[in-house]
Amino acid sequence: MAELATIARPYAEALFGVAEAGDIAAWSTLVQELAQVARLPEVLSIASSPKVSRAQVSELLLAAVKSPLKDNAQAKNLVQMLVDNHRLQLLPEIAVQFEELKNAREGAADVLIVSAFPLEGAQLNDLVASLERKFKRKLKPTVEIDPSLIGGVRVTVGDEVLDTSVRARLASMQTALTA
């Protein structure tokens, strides 16, 4: 996975440079849609077929997205370059890195909140507000439910993890008692 990230980084940075001259949100939508299409096994199968030309693969990818930017010459060039260089499998990683660049520019970050129980609106808003104060940036939350946590939450922002779950506390106590 690290190799994909390394290979995808220049593509994401170049694309972000193009997006800065226009509408970053629109480019973000386009890249996310292209990444979703590129994840489909059928698309990868067609792309690797010798019976289908590279131009046809590019047209297929662009036809599968709804973004109005799909008709943009730079978007067409990106897709054609990825197809020509057999790099379609990079699109999901390019999308991830593009979002990271976008978040860094906005002073924001994606946060994964794993909770033992569903978080309701006000409860989630309070948690996100306190996390924004702690991490000193705007957070975009994604919530997952994991009953094995027993209680509490595990928060992941980038490479930082804050685990206040009951399961983590029990594991900590077990380590302390057996040491």
Swiss-Prot record:
GO MF annotation terms: proton-transporting ATP synthase activity, rotational mechanism
SUPFAM superfamilies noted in UniProt: N-terminal domain of the delta subunit of the F1F0-ATP synthase
Domain of life, per lineage: Bacteria
Topology term for the membrane: Peripheral membrane protein
Keywords from the named record: ATP synthesis, Cell inner membrane, Cell membrane, CF(1), Hydrogen ion transport, Ion transport, Membrane, Transport
Subcellular locations according to the entry: Cell inner membrane
Membrane-traversing stretches: none
Pfam family of the protein (one): OSCP
UniProt keyword Ion transport present: yes
GO cellular-component term (any): proton-transporting ATP synthase complex
Primary location group: membrane
Protein family membership: Belongs to the ATPase delta chain family.
Function according to Swiss-Prot or TrEMBL: F(1)F(0) ATP synthase produces ATP from ADP in the presence of a proton or sodium gradient. F-type ATPases consist of two structural domains, F(1) containing the extramembraneous catalytic core and F(0) containing the membrane proton channel, linked together by a central stalk and a peripheral stalk. During catalysis, ATP synthesis in the catalytic domain of F(1) is coupled via a rotary mechanism of the central stalk subunits to proton translocation. This protein is part of the stalk that links CF(0) to CF(1). It either transmits conformational changes from CF(0) to CF(1) or is implicated in proton conduction.
Subunit: F-type ATPases have 2 components, F(1) - the catalytic core - and F(0) - the membrane proton channel. F(1) has five subunits: alpha(3), beta(3), gamma(1), delta(1), epsilon(1). F(0) has three main subunits: a(1), b(2) and c(10-14). The alpha and beta chains form an alternating ring which encloses part of the gamma chain. F(1) is attached to F(0) by a central stalk formed by the gamma and epsilon chains, while a peripheral stalk is formed by the delta and b chains.
NCBIfam families registered for this protein in UniProt: ATP_synt_delta (TIGR01145), PRK05758.2-2 (NF004402)
Protein name: ATP synthase subunit delta
Source organism (scientific name): Paraburkholderia phytofirmans (strain DSM 17436 / LMG 22146 / PsJN) (Burkholderia phytofirmans)
Upper taxonomic lineage: Bacteria, Pseudomonadati, Pseudomonadota, Betaproteobacteria, Burkholderiales
Name of the gene encoding the protein in the UniProt record: atpH
